[in-house]
Amino acid sequence: MDGKVGNTTTGCPVMHGGMTSAGTSNTAWWPNALNLDILHQHDTKTNPMGKDFNYREEVKKLNFEALKKDLHALMTDSQAWWPADWGHYGGLMIRMSWHAAGSYRVADGRGGAGTGNQRFAPLNSWPDNVNLDKARRLLWPIKKKYGNKISWADLIVLAGTIAYESMGLKTFGFGFGREDIWHPEKDVYWGSEQEWLGAKRYDDKDRQSLETPLAAVQMGLIYVNPEGVNGQPDPLRTAQDVRVTFGRMAMNDEETVALTAGGHTVGKCHGNGNAKFLGPEPEAADIEDQGLGWINKTTRGIGRNTVSSGIEGAWTTHPTQWDNGYFYLLLNYDWELKKSPAGAWQWEPIHIKEEDKPVDVEDPAIRHNPIMTDADMAIKMDPVYRKIAERFYKDPDYFAEVFARAWFKLTHRDMGPKTRYIGPDVPKEDLIWQDPVPAGNRAYDIAAAKAKIAASNLTIGEMVSTAWDSARTFRGSDKRGGANGARIRLKPQKDWEGNEPQRLTKVLRILEDIAADTGASVADVIVLAGNVGIEKAAKAAGFDIIVPFAPGRGDATDDMTDAESFDVLEPLHDGYRNWLKKAYDVRPEELMLDRTQLMGLTAHEMTVLVGGLRVLGTNHNNTQHGVFTDRVGALTNDFFVNLTDMANVWIPSKDNLYEIRDRKAGNIKWTATRVDLVFGSNSILRSYAEVYAQDDNKGKFIQDFVAAWTKVMNADRFDLA
């Protein structure tokens, strides 16, 4: 290509301005500009299924038993192009499921197996996911057969669960309902490193400073480095890494030991060869490789000669059956450091009995030493983990039960409440990590409840702020939080600084009495009060409206709430209420963008909500920043009118504060934060602000505000169609 546009004989026939793989992006030109792309994902333009397709309804038509039968058959149907170890694909399928679910992190709820994201970059090409492309390709005939009735996300998780069943474990259950995405996620921060296995996520040497929200120690790993900290064996240091990373996946010490042991009871590591012969990962592979990566085109590279992690060997004597052999070998033998054929650090037993060695994956007449990773040795050497391991060793049934429950938690943690689970194998038991909420009353007089709220002495700001605070905790990432359950009245939420405990206590006292009088749940009354406040504010602006409301929220109790698990939902900032708990390295407008994405809102919904909430008097602690109106409590478009008025000039005052002055007179009219001014500064957000500032769009502003408000209030109403 010589780049001469229009030269049809010797030049490139493609207009370079339209090329998809070249050119400089806006982000490259202006790296500090607010990037709204994370709010514009997973829409109809990328989804081939059409707007009328509803996976959660389609999966109900699935022949569940036939699918499971086919998966059982797949486990022992070894394919020549990628042979099964010992004739059983169980270990491979479990690793695929584990690595899909294990990317979840509790801090922001992102990652996990709920979207089928392992099919896309970067996860499909992570160093920790070497050869999992083969597992998904082995599943393709089953996906092809059952089609739209089973998502990749569900199938990837189910395959690991069925693998355990096929090897003798009684699993705890399974819930269908994970919907596929169709392109890589733009909102997930996997780390700032520019190279695989980079580790620029710590700022000290004691391994306690892993960057939030990350839950893996190096770029491209699921949790810890199996060879040791930064590839150097040290089981006690690795134990610290294990505890931190599993904790950030919402697992306690017992669950951590169970998952580590149960994951390593079956299958093996692969490092019997030279890693330099592996081809590039899937995203960098040649077009003729058709999406498969790490292809060895130099040596055999399959079966006993496979290289994945570089560690070589099985953990147990019988790697295709569920048993207690992991603890038997780990606790009864002494172990020494060795190097695998691929050059990776691993632990091997000293003076092991021949009958305790696992056989070769291809020739049962050959036996090899079992191996342990540094993480396994951490289970043996860390005193807390060791005590748990010894109990599991002495009580195999207890171990199997704890593991089955932990596996279920691992693979369902990002699905939200149990009401979202579909299928015949959903456990009846309510689990506290599912944040259970009882069914609410729908048969009460909504009009009477609204009348009592309107007659109370609550201000518009108090009603709207309380409803907002109750609902804003919702995270679309793992479907946690939200207004349903009214957990804002329970610990820890009632004491969060962002919820203004003194104001909250006053408002809840009044709303709880109204709930008791009308038979409504407190959760419903909180939302209803916000709606009443908005209706009053719209009337003050000259518009009579009814804010949509769907009754039926329930009230959770302390017994239904794992208070500690809700700590990660505490808002440390809220641009919608113009509040920061403290100064952060990240710019306030970027924090608001992250919050907006988690809440499932678009850029124009964010815009209209901020503009409306400012004039309703909902700022945290009643600050006046961004309140560009002299009619507080009226749902007007004044925020946008005054933001876009060139009669004003914006002057920096101090960190994150600005003065809005009259351009001619110079007097201060208002103050603002960066969150306010970004709606006039960012070209995209300004285009939305101008729409809402127009003289003919006062009604549209209210209509759009109410629609966005209702979306937030109902974000966790999975019971609604």
Swiss-Prot record:
Homodimer or homotetramer. Binds 1 heme b (iron(II)-protoporphyrin IX) group per dimer. Bifunctional enzyme with both catalase and broad-spectrum peroxidase activity. It comes from Legionella pneumophila (strain Corby). Its cofactor is heme b. This is Catalase-peroxidase 1. It is an enzyme of class 1 (oxidoreductase). Belongs to the peroxidase family. Peroxidase/catalase subfamily. GO terms for molecular function: catalase activity; heme binding; metal ion binding. There is a cross-link at residues 223-249 (Tryptophyl-tyrosyl-methioninium (Tyr-Met) (with W-98)). The gene is katG1. It comes from the Bacteria. GO terms for biological process: cellular response to hydrogen peroxide; hydrogen peroxide catabolic process. Heme b binds at residue 264. It catalyses: H2O2 + AH2 = A + 2 H2O; 2 H2O2 = O2 + 2 H2O. InterPro entries: Catalase_peroxidase, Haem_peroxidase, Haem_peroxidase_sf, Peroxidases_AS. The active site is at 99 (proton acceptor). The keyword Transmembrane helix does not apply. Its EC number is 1.11.1.21. Transmembrane segments: none annotated. Formation of the three residue Trp-Tyr-Met cross-link is important for the catalase, but not the peroxidase activity of the enzyme. Keywords: Heme, Hydrogen peroxide, Iron, Metal-binding, Oxidoreductase, Peroxidase. One of its GO terms (cellular component) is cytosol. There is a cross-link at residues 98-223 (Tryptophyl-tyrosyl-methioninium (Trp-Tyr) (with M-249)). Pfam families: peroxidase (PF00141).
